Amino acid sequence: MAATASPGAGRMDGKPRTSPKSVKFLFGGLAGMGATVFVQPLDLVXNRMQLSGEGAKTREYKTSFHALTSILKAEGLRGIYTGLSAGLLRQATYTTTRLGIYTVLFERLTGADGTPPGFLLKALIGMTAGATGAFVGPPAEVALIRMTADGRLPADQRRGYKNVFNALIRIAREEGVPTLWRGCIPTMARAVVVNAAQLASYSQSKQFLLDSGYFSDNILCHFCAIMISGLVTTAASMPVDIVKTRIQNMRMIDEKPEYKNGLDVLLKVVRYEGFFSLWKGFTPYYARLGPHTVLTFIFLEQMNKAYKRLFLSG
């Protein structure tokens, strides 16, 4: 008699056993949250820089380093972690959705023989996952922008949210639930730009380095390609990011919003602050992008390995 096969053993389609979809989503969020603990200060500095000099006012911060030292001096070490609860919730919503959907689509579109999707299909998967995550994430994004911006304002103008949940409840009660999705379109646009730019620029950068003859296909080459990719991605996405930041932080003036739409933000920034102000906060944005991506995938890889070892081995 032939032995009865154990559940999941000897997959007929040739694909290896994998974790349930719920676990993929969970690990994606946890990985992003772990990375955020390390890069939250850079997020805060980037947001402060993007709001500095808004509306033709004098810039509070001359450089990113000046912003960091000013925040430490005025608000203390704890001040650079302002908005951490919102940053964690953003990862729990945006990154959970983005990485979960990406992993599910990637596995579904992988061939029966294990052949991964081609470059264009990968790019489409990445943009779809990014845009979907960006639709889920705005409530936490709005809370994060406002919480990190509070410290730069005079005491009588601060919103004074105690934590992300207090922020969400107050925003919904005082300004209406739709305000939680303010800036949703530029947030989704940024996600598409970031995912497309990262994939395309990393692939091209790696190929350029290999073709130069000075690099082999090793960790040094991958690191340099990531840094070049981060530079391209930052340059491409920052104008959209500053639109998102300004819209999500804006107040009502005489019952009218400060900005009509994203295009109005772009025109006012260029008119009153200069064309290159669209790239305010470039340094902390770039410095955050690489480490956050690397840390997220390190945490994700370790959790996946642990799950396979504990639940899928044998």
From Swiss-Prot:
GO BP of this protein: gluconeogenesis; lipid transport; malate-aspartate shuttle
Tissues of expression: Expressed in liver, heart and brain.
Keyword check for Cell wall biogenesis/degradation: no
This protein's record includes keyword Transmembrane helix: yes
Reaction(s) catalysed by this chain's protein: (S)-malate(in) + 2-oxoglutarate(out) = (S)-malate(out) + 2-oxoglutarate(in); malonate(in) + 2-oxoglutarate(out) = malonate(out) + 2-oxoglutarate(in); succinate(in) + 2-oxoglutarate(out) = succinate(out) + 2-oxoglutarate(in); maleate(in) + 2-oxoglutarate(out) = maleate(out) + 2-oxoglutarate(in)
InterPro entries in UniProt: Mito_Metabolite_Transporter (IPR050391), Mitochondrial_sb/sol_carrier (IPR018108), Mt_carrier_dom_sf (IPR023395)
Listed name of the protein: Mitochondrial 2-oxoglutarate/malate carrier protein
Organism this protein belongs to: Rattus norvegicus
Taxonomic classification: Eukaryota, Metazoa, Chordata, Craniata, Vertebrata
